């Protein structure tokens, strides 16, 4: 339940508007509300980090509005809370009126939801399930450079789950569509909320089964097999892609060293 922020309120401050995050001096604000001119603002506590409250304030600031990607190097738990705040702020902003009857909606007092004041329809934040998979072939990993990441970073394959599709089917389809190969021995590893814009990454490992690499040029700039001890530029630590790569490298080292 939201409330008005008072002078002595303190904690982490997620000030967000239109999927942007307020980052004075390039950092997520932490401390007393008065230090950041937040007294009197309406805020919602969205969690705790190391015993301190994490507050969401839906507000546009004139300066220092940036992407949540800028705080990706934070501790994983705090980064996830920042991402939660950005996603919730966008959810509340985009659900002011009911999609069924057009009447005004209001936030639930018991959960993250918006309720229609007329037809009683209930809306929840959208979450888009995605798969991400590290594929191994003997002592090598399949890594690709995506068209949307023209910075030299090579990563594992990923994609959105389609309607009526299992996670396993999504892995097989995405891998075939993007690289032209088939995989086998699929194994679930972990998951990670990913606020770009509202994904839930489900991470897998798989083994190469058959086929030659034929990339989808709309998705990939290039893809290739890289030996575990001779890898290109990788995604940053803290990402689920980096974990999948490091876990696969560890398995290769155990077998080949």
From Swiss-Prot:
Enzyme class per UniProt: hydrolase
Described function: mRNA decapping enzyme that specifically removes the nicotinamide adenine dinucleotide (NAD) cap from a subset of mRNAs by hydrolyzing the diphosphate linkage to produce nicotinamide mononucleotide (NMN) and 5' monophosphate mRNA. The NAD-cap is present at the 5'-end of some mRNAs and stabilizes RNA against 5'-processing. Has preference for mRNAs with a 5'-end purine. Catalyzes the hydrolysis of a broad range of dinucleotide pyrophosphates.
Position of sequence motif Nudix box: 159-180
Organism, as annotated: Shigella flexneri
Binding positions (Zn(2+)): 98, 101, 116, 119
UniProt keyword list: Hydrolase, Magnesium, Manganese, Metal-binding, NAD, Zinc
GO terms (BP aspect): NAD catabolic process; NADH metabolic process; NADP catabolic process
EC number: 3.6.1.-, 3.6.1.22
Domain Nudix hydrolase: 125-248
Binding site for substrate: 25, 69, 111, 124, 192-199, 241
Cofactor entry: Mg(2+); Mn(2+); Zn(2+)
Cofactor note: Divalent metal cations. Mg(2+) or Mn(2+).
Any one Gene Ontology molecular-function term assigned to this protein's record: NAD+ diphosphatase activity
Positions annotated to bind a divalent metal cation 1: 158, 178, 219
Gene: nudC
Protein name (Swiss-Prot/TrEMBL): NAD-capped RNA hydrolase NudC
Subunit structure: Homodimer.
Residues annotated for a divalent metal cation 3 binding in this entry: 174, 178, 219
Family recorded in the similarity comment: Belongs to the Nudix hydrolase family. NudC subfamily.
List of residues binding a divalent metal cation 2: 174
GO cellular component: cytosol
Catalytic activity, as annotated: a 5'-end NAD(+)-phospho-ribonucleoside in mRNA + H2O = a 5'-end phospho-adenosine-phospho-ribonucleoside in mRNA + beta-nicotinamide D-ribonucleotide + 2 H(+); NAD(+) + H2O = beta-nicotinamide D-ribonucleotide + AMP + 2 H(+); NADH + H2O = reduced beta-nicotinamide D-ribonucleotide + AMP + 2 H(+)
């Amino acid at each position: 339940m939201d409330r008005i922020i008072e002078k002595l309120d303190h904690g982490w401050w997620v000030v967000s508007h239109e999927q942007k995050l307020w980052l004075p001096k390039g950092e997520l604000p932490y401390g007393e509300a008065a230090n950041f001119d937040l007294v009197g603002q309406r805020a919602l506590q969205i969690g705790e980090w190391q015993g301190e409250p994490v507050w969401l304030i839906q507000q546009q600031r004139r300066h220092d509005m940036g992407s949540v990607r800028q705080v990706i190097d934070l501790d994983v738990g705090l980064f996830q809370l920042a991402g939660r705040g950005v996603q919730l702020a966008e959810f509340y902003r985009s659900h002011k009126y009911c999609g069924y009857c057009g009447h005004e909606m209001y936030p639930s007092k018991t959960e993250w939801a918006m309720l229609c004041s007329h037809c009683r329809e209930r809306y929840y934040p959208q979450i888009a399930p995605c798969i991400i998979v590290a594929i191994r072939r003997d002592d090598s990993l399949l890594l690709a450079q995506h068209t949307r990441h023209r910075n030299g970073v090579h990563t594992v394959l990923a994609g959105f789950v389609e309607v009526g599709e299992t996670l396993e089917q999504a892995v097989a389809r995405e891998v075939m569509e993007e690289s032209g190969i088939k995989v086998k021995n699929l194994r679930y590893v972990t998951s990670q909320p990913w606020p770009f814009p509202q994904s839930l990454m489900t991470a897998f490992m798989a083994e190469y089964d058959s086929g030659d690499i034929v990339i989808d040029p709309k998705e990939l700039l290039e893809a290739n097999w890289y030996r575990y001890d001779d890898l290109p530029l990788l995604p940053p630590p803290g990402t689920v892609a980096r974990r999948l790569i490091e876990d696969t490298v560890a398995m290769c080292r155990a077998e080949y060293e």
